[in-house]
Regions:
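Bacterial N-terminal signal peptides that target proteins for export
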Residues: 1-11
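Sec/Tat signal peptide C-region and signal peptidase I cleavage site
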Residues: 20-24
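N-terminal mature ectodomain segment of secretory-pathway/periplasmic proteins
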Residues: 26-109
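A short, amphipathic edge element
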Residues: 28, 57-60, 134-147, 192-195
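Extended interaction-bearing regions that mediate binding to partners or small molecules
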Residues: 35-36, 82, 140, 194-197
Length: 251
């Protein structure tokens, strides 16, 4: 090989080595900006949940969600309020910045709370198409990111969890103009497991928020559609409303 060819090869290799960390850093900066724009002291929403299974059989529930804090350092309560057979069923989630969340589920018909074991986080949440793990709120610091492709109006980002997860990695589509996530594809060792699409965005107190979320369980050919008819940010909440005692009494 000539000295010129060798020099070109070395420059090409050096360029590739230098470009790789910048590419990865760009992806992290994008996700940090996504998180920054979504941050709020608290969140409240009410809406409907439709589970559409095989044969297009539809089961509809209504629920309320409250969250105090954000992105890892947060507490949340999710509670069904209709129909009567599921009214009062609730889930308390204590999120952490450096580990998986703690979760307890309350079922009025049995009159006691159930701690959701870590090994059970991959199971479906109360007949829906998302798992208990999907309900966690994790900080971007718990993931590694790489920019997979630039698709014009959106970035496609490959996300890999640093902590134990049912998912090996996921793809996220982030709109460039609003830094909102519009689609997520979740993969396990067996392949694509779930997709999540966010639609009908509206800006509320400066935060772009999807009013419709659709989760598809690819392995079950089932989907769950969430529609939010009431959404509020930075509303007054108390730590006392995010305890097991509060979960029991329906606070």
């Amino acid at each position: 090989m000539s000295s010129v060819s060798t020099c070109k090869a070395m420059l090409a290799l050096l360029g590739a080595v230098m470009a790789a960390p910048v590419f990865a850093q760009d992806a992290r900066q994008i996700m940090e900006e996504v998180q920054r724009r979504q941050r709020a002291d608290s969140q409240h929403y009410e809406g409907t949940l439709e589970v559409i299974g095989n044969g297009n059989r539809i089961a509809t529930k209504r629920w309320v969600y409250d969250r105090l804090g954000s992105f890892g350092a947060s507490k949340a309560v999710l509670r069904f309020i209709a129909p009567p057979e599921v009214k009062g069923v609730g889930l308390l989630i204590l999120n952490h910045t450096d580990k998986a969340s703690d979760q307890w589920m309350w079922r009025p018909n049995i009159g006691r709370e159930q701690r959701i074991a870590f090994q059970d986080r991959s199971t479906r949440f109360f007949g829906t198409d998302f798992s208990f793990e999907d309900l966690e709120e994790r900080d971007v610091g718990q993931y590694d990111f790489q920019l997979s492709s630039d698709e014009g109006a959106a970035w496609k980002i490959d996300s890999t969890p640093r902590k134990t997860s049912q998912y090996t990695h996921s793809f996220l589509w982030v709109k460039k103009d609003t830094y909102t996530i519009t689609r997520v594809e979740l993969y396990t060792k067996k392949g694509l497991m779930r997709t999540i699409d966010y639609r009908d965005f509206e800006q509320l107190t400066g935060i772009w928020t999807a009013r419709t979320t659709e989760i598809v369980d690819v392995t079950r050919n089932s989907r769950t559609i969430l529609k939010y008819d009431k959404l509020e940010y930075n509303v007054p909440m108390k730590d006392a409303d995010f305890t097991i005692d509060a979960l029991r009494r329906g606070a």
